[in-house]
Each structure stands twice: as structure tokens, then as C-alpha cells.
């Protein structure tokens, strides 16, 4: 099992294609490069990112069927940057997973954010945020608790989980039968 990510940073215009895992083992030098690539570009600060995020993003990309690079909108975000963004938008969480190195905002040019959201929700690896009307539409993927925002309707969740087995709660607040 070899896992390679092909990334493009929307802000720095950098591109990185890197194998970060081989035979079930993370490659330390690759993780260090990913930490630098996903740095807070406003402050040029990096953090040790949670490698489970790379596995989750890799799986999302695989399931999407795309061969296009993943466009990174945001990786690590320092507390100072997070506070700056919070002062401009109510959509920025006070205790953001970005500040912990556990989140990535992304899009893939030839995959709709609706499809990326559906795949992310089905994976149940963490949080999935959906921002279809941002300047550049994107999804937020993190390896925190399993949740999605905005919440999906009961009909949407049933279409993704026909057996009802999901940790996601529909917008009506009533869990599906397999919860």
C-alpha cells in the first residue's frame, strides 16, 4: 500500500506530489514536507499536522475518482490568523481544528463540492463542512469528532446510508435507525 498526495496550494501557488505512506508506515521526511506545504501562509508558520488527516484526504481523493490535484484552500491556521478570520466571519470556529493541525479546506477542480461532501460524510472519519457559495467553493475535512455542517436532511442521509448505520444526525435531530 503506497499513498501519494498531489496537492496545489491556492494561496502560495506551490504544487507538491509526495508519497507520505508506504507499507502501512508514514515517511517522516514526507510528513515534514507536508507540514511545511500546509503552513499558515499569512504568518509562514507550520505545525506538526495529524497524519490521519493525510490518510483521510488521500481516501477522499481516491473515492472521488479524480486524477486532478487537490486544491488546498487552508491547512494549518495559527491562533492569530484564526482570530483575524473570526473577526471577519462568523463561519470561523473559535476552537478550529485548523489550529490543531487536524483540518484541511479543499476542492478538486473536476469534482463538485456536493460530491466531496457526500464522500466525506460516508467516510465518517471526522468533520465535514460544506461551503458551496464561498468565492472558491470548498469542503472542510478534519479528523476531529464525526459531524457535518450544515447538517444533512434525513433524505440525504438515508441516500448515503441506506442501512441507517451512521453517527451523523439529520437536520431534524432524530438519529437514523442504525445509529
Predicted regions and their residues:
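Mature N-terminal segment immediately following signal peptide/propeptide cleavage
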Residues: 4-11, 15-21
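Acidic helix-start/capping segments at beta-turn-to-alpha-helix junctions
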Residues: 69-84
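Charged, often glycine-rich, active-site loop that binds/positions anionic groups
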Residues: 80-96
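Loop/turn elements at helix/coil->beta-strand transitions in domains of secreted/extracellular proteins
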Residues: 14, 66-70, 124-128
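Cysteine-centered nucleophilic/redox motifs
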Residues: 56-61, 78-81, 106
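Active-site acidic/histidine clusters and adjacent loop/turn architecture
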Residues: 22-73
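Catalytic cores and adjacent binding grooves of peptidoglycan-active enzymes
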Residues: 3-8, 91-179
Amino acid at each position: 500500500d503506497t499513498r501519494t498526495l498531489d496537492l496545489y496550494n491556492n494561496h502560495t501557488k506551490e504544487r507538491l506530489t509526495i508519497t507520505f505512506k508506504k507499507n502501512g508506515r508514514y515517511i517522516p521526511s514526507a510528513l515534514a514536507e507536508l507540514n511545511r506545504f500546509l503552513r499558515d501562509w499569512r504568518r509562514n508558520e507550520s505545525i506538526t499536522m495529524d497524519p490521519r488527516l493525510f490518510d483521510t484526504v488521500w481516501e477522499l481523493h481516491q473515492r472521488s475518482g479524480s486524477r486532478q490535484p487537490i486544491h488546498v484552500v487552508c491547512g494549518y491556521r495559527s491562533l492569530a490568523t484564526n482570530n483575524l478570520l473570526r473577526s471577519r466571519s462568523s463561519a470561523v470556529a473559535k476552537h478550529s481544528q485548523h489550529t490543531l493541525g487536524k483540518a484541511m479546506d479543499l476542492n478538486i477542480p473536476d469534482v463538485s463540492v456536493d460530491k466531496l461532501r457526500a464522500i466525506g460524510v460516508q467516510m465518517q472519519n471526522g468533520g465535514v463542512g460544506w461551503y458551496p457559495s464561498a468565492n472558491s467553493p470548498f469542503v472542510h475535512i478534519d479528523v476531529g469528532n464525526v459531524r457535518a455542517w450544515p447538517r444533512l436532511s434525513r433524505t440525504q442521509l438515508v441516500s448515503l446510508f441506506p442501512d441507517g448505520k451512521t453517527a451523523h444526525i439529520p437536520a431534524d435531530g432524530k438519529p437514523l435507525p442504525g445509529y
